[in-house]
A protein has these predicted regions:
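Hydrophobic residues in beta-strands of the RecA-like P-loop NTPase core, especially within AAA+ ATPase
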Residues: 192, 376, 411-412
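Glycine-rich phosphate-binding loop of nucleotide-binding enzymes
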Residues: 134-222, 467, 488, 497-499, ...
Length: 517
C-alpha cells in the first residue's frame, strides 16, 4: 500500500516522504518501508515521523471554529494536496536492483515523487539470507509475519553482546540465542546461571531451559547443596589467585591489594585464603605492609568462610575438571548458583576463576578444545576501567579472540561501564531498550548511522531488539520470538532434534533439579 512520496533526498542525510496516510499513527519508528525508484527499490527504515510547524495550525489550535474550516486529511485543495499532512524521515539501508536482484549499499537517491510503501514479506525475503547455520530470533517489526534469522556460526566467531535495561527480556533473548547455537552445532556454551533460568525449567517463569530441549548436550552443576539432581560444584582454594579475590571483593583499597600480593609471594603452595588468615606483620616483615591494611584484608577475606563449595581435593581435581571433560565432548554446561544467585560476590568470584582457568587452557592448547561461548552476565563488574586491570582474562578474550576457540558473550544493562577497549571488539550487538543516554551511546559506539539508532534504541518497546553486526545481512529491529515449547521446537529446533523420551524423564525430576519442591 502506498503511504507517501519522496519530497527530499540525500545519500548522507536520508530521505523525506510526504505521507498520504489518513492517520500518521499507522507508521512507527523502525518500520521497514520500500521507496520505488526508477531502477532500484530502496529498502529503508523509518527514522522519524513528524508534523512540521504550521502557522495556520498555530492560529487554529484551540479555536472554536477549527472543526468547521479545517479540511480533513483526506480533503484535497487543488493540486497542492491536503493543507495538513505528516512527513517521515527514512534511512536508506539497502538498494535492490529490480533487474538483477543484486543488493548494494546506498550510494544514490530516488527521484522526486518516488512512491513509498510498507515493506512486504516478498521485499524482506529478498534482503535476508538463510544459511544452514541460521536460527530464528523473532519477527520483523512492521511487516506481516516474517521470521528473521541470525547466522549462528558467524555470531560465535567473534565477541558479541546483549545489552538492555532490567526487565526488557534479556534472559529470554539469551535463551533463544543459546538454543540457536546448540541446535546448529556451531559451539558449546558455558552459562553462569545466577537465577535458575537455563537448566531444565526457569525458576522464575517456569519456561523451559536448555537441558529441557537438549538433554544430551547440556550438563548441570550447582553451587547449592540443595540441588540433588545436578552434580555438586567444588572449587579447590589452592587455585585462587590475588586477582580472583580483587575482582570478587571489589572493595579492596590500594594498600590492601599491595598487602595481598606480598602475602601471595610467600604462600609456598598453600591456598591463598588460609595464608592471608595466618599472616602477621612479623612473618611478612615488609615495609609496604601496614597493620591496618592487613587487618582490613583479613576481614574481607572472611566473607568467603561461608562458601560450602570451597574444598581441597585430591590432586587438585575440582569441578573444573568435570566442566573441562564436558567441553571436550562438545557439551554445554549450566552452572546453577541456586541460593547463591543473589550474592554478587560469589558470582564474581566463581565466574572469574573458571573463566581464567579456561582461558589459560585454551591459549596454551587451543587445538584440543572445541569452540566454547562464555556468557558473562553483569559484564561491567568485570570490565569496568577500575577492575579490568585485574580481570585481564576478559579484556584479553575480547582483544585476541581470533586466536582461540573461546568466545566472550557479554550480557549487561550498563554498557557505558564497560571499557571502551572491550566494546570496540564486539562484532555483533543485540541491543534492547536502554534509557540512560550514556548507555545508549556506549552500546552503539562505532555503529554506522549511530544517531538514528540512538533514537530507535531509546524508544524500543519491551521484548524488542535491534540486531547490528555481521551475523545478519542488515541492521534490523526484531520482535523477539515468544519463548515457549512450541515456538522453540517449530522455529529453532526443527524436526529430528527434540528427544521426547529424555525430556519426559528429566521433567519428572524438575523440582528436585532446582531443590525448590
Amino acid at each position: 500500500m502506498k503511504i507517501g512520496e519522496i519530497v527530499a533526498a540525500s545519500v548522507i542525510d536520508g530521505l523525506v516522504a510526504k505521507l498520504q496516510l489518513g492517520n500518521p499513527e499507522e507508521l512507527k519508528i523502525a518500520f521497514p518501508v520500500i521507496v520505488e525508484g526508477a531502477r532500484y527499490d530502496f529498502y529503508c527504515l523509518v527514522e522519524d515521523v513528524l508534523n512540521e510547524e504550521s502557522d495556520i495550525a498555530d492560529q487554529l489550535a484551540g479555536s472554536t471554529i477549527a472543526d468547521v474550516i479545517v479540511p480533513r486529511p483526506e480533503t484535497h485543495e487543488g493540486y497542492g494536496g491536503p493543507i495538513f499532512y505528516s512527513k517521515a524521515k527514512l534511512r536508506m539501508i539497502q538498494l535492490v536492483d529490480r533487474e538483477t536482484k543484486k543488493l548494494s549499499e546506498p550510494q544514490t537517491i530516488p527521484p522526486y515523487f518516488s512512491a513509498c510503501r510498507h515493506a512486504t514479506r516478498d521485499d524482506v525475503e529478498r534482503i535476508y539470507e538463510v544459511t544452514d547455520t541460521s536460527a530464528t530470533l523473532g519477527t520483523i517489526t512492521g511487516v506481516e509475519p516474517f521470521h528473521v534469522q541470525l547466522d549462528m556460526k558467524k555470531l560465535v566467531e567473534k565477541p558479541f553482546a546483549i545489552f538492555g535495561r532490567t526487565g526488557t527480556g534479556k534472559s529470554i533473548l539469551n535463551k533463544l540465542v543459546c538454543a540457536g547455537i546448540l541446535s546448529k552445532d556451531v559451539g558449546s556454551v558455558l552459562i553462569f546461571d545466577m537465577h535458575g533460568e537455563y537448566g531444565v525449567f526457569s525458576a522464575t517463569d517456569k519456561t523451559e531451559g536448555l537441558k529441557y530441549f537438549f538433554p544430551g548436550k547440556v550438563d548441570i552443576l550447582s553451587l547449592d547443596p540443595k540441588n540433588k539432581e545436578a552434580r555438586p560444584f567444588v572449587l579447590d582454594p589452592r587455585e585462587i589467585t590475588p586477582e580472583d579475590l580483587i575482582v570478587a571483593l571489589q572493595d579492596l583499597t590500594s594498600p590492601m591489594v599491595d598487602t595481598l600480593y606480598e602475602i601471595a609471594k610467600g604462600r609456598a603452595g598453600r591456598d591463598l585464603i588460609s595464608t592471608v588468615k595466618d599472616a602477621s606483620m612479623e612473618v611478612l616483615g615488609s615495609e609496604r605492609t601496614h597493620e591496618m591494611s592487613l587487618q582490613g584484608l583479613k576481614r574481607r577475606i572472611g566473607r568467603l568462610d561461608r562458601l560450602p563449595f570451597l574444598k581441597e581435593t585430591k590432586e587438585g581435581k575440582d569441578s573444573f575438571n568435570q566442566i573441562l571433560a564436558a567441553i571436550r565432548e562438545s557439551k554445554s554446561v549450566v552452572l546453577d548458583f541456586g541460593d547463591f544467585g543473589t550474592d554478587q560476590m560469589v558470582y564474581l568470584f566463581v565466574a572469574n576463576i573458571l573463566s581464567r582457568r579456561l582461558f589459560d587452557l585454551y591459549t596454551e592448547r587451543n587445538e584440543d578444545f572445541p569452540r566454547l561461548v562464555l556468557f558473562l552476565e553483569e559484564a561491567h563488574k568485570f570490565l569496568s576501567p577500575e577492575i579490568a586491570p585485574y580481570a585481564h582474562t576478559f579484556s584479553r578474550l575480547a582483544r585476541e579472540t581470533r586466536k582461540f576457540n573461546l568466545i566472550l558473550a557479554l550480557i549487561d544493562q550498563r554498557p557505558s561501564r564497560i571499557s571502551d577497549e572491550v566494546r570496540s571488539q564486539l562484532a555483533n550487538r543485540l541491543v534492547m531498550s536502554l534509557k540512560e543516554p550514556s548507555d545508549v551511546e556506549a552500546a552503539l559506539a562505532g555503529v554506522p548511522d549511530k544517531k538514528m539508532w540512538e533514537n530507535i534504541i531509546a524508544k524500543l518497546p519491551l521484548r524488542t531488539v535491534a540486531v547490528i553486526g555481521d551475523a545478519i545481512r542488515i541492521p534490523t529491529v526484531i520482535d523477539v520470538l515468544s519463548y515457549d515449547d512450541l515456538n522453540v521446537r517449530e522455529h529453532i529446533l526443527g524436526a529430528g532434534i527434540f528427544d521426547e523420551g529424555a525430556v519426559q524423564e528429566i521433567a519428572k525430576h524438575a523440582d528436585d533439579v532446582f531443590g525448590r519442591g
